[in-house]
Amino acid sequence: MQTRDIYPESNNSYSLGTNAKRWANIHTNDLNLSNEGSTNDVDGTWGQYTIQEGEDNLYLINKRSGKKYKFLLQEVS
């Protein structure tokens, strides 16, 4: 499984892990999120976002509008 893509046979039909059997860590470059083809529970719309890392910040890019946001992070000890 070192040189293959893993993807479901049909859209929005399978989960990766369960509440009882979770993956320990996910190692990825950018994180691409989309619920296109369905709606969210808050306002009934759909979105498409990418989370990217900077040197000192995390950024959220709205792929539908092109708007970019910076996460407001507060250091904790």
Residue ranges and their predicted role:
Residues 1-57:
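Intrinsic low-complexity, repeat-rich intrinsically disordered segments enriched
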Residues 57-74:
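Short, surface-exposed terminal/edge motifs of secreted or surface/virion proteins that either
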